[in-house]
C-alpha cells in the first residue's frame, strides 16, 4: 500500500502521465517497482486501472490548459498531455467531460467573461 502511494506520488509530482505512450511496464522499469503493482492491486487501491488513472490525470491537465491558455491550439494541448492523435484526444476528453475540448473551452471562457462584466 505504501509502495503504491509512492508510485502515485511520483506519477503526479514528476508529471509522468504526460509521457506519450507511457505504459505500466515502462513506469515499473523507471520507478523500479514490481510489475504486479500495476494489475489488480492498482485497481483495488485506486478504483481505476493504470491506463484509466493516466487518462484521468491527462484530461484534468487538458482542462486546465484549455482554460488557462486559450492561445494554445487543441492539437498542441493534446500533445502537451502526451496524446499524439487528435481523434484519440477528442474521444477521451468527450468521454471524460461529456463535451468536446472546443466546447469546453468556449463554455469556460464565456463564463469567465460573464464574471468580469458583473
What are the residue ranges of the model-derived segments?
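Basic, amphipathic alpha-helical hairpins
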Residues: 5-22, 42, 46, 63-72, ...
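Helix-turn-helix/homeodomain-like alpha-helical modules used for DNA recognition
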Residues: 87-105, 118
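Append "Primarily bacterial transcriptional regulators
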Residues: 22-34, 38, 42, 76-84, ...
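Recognition helices and adjacent regulatory flanks at domain boundaries
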Residues: 12-14, 37, 91-92, 107
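Terminal helix-turn-helix DNA-binding modules in bacterial transcription factors
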Residues: 44-84, 106-118
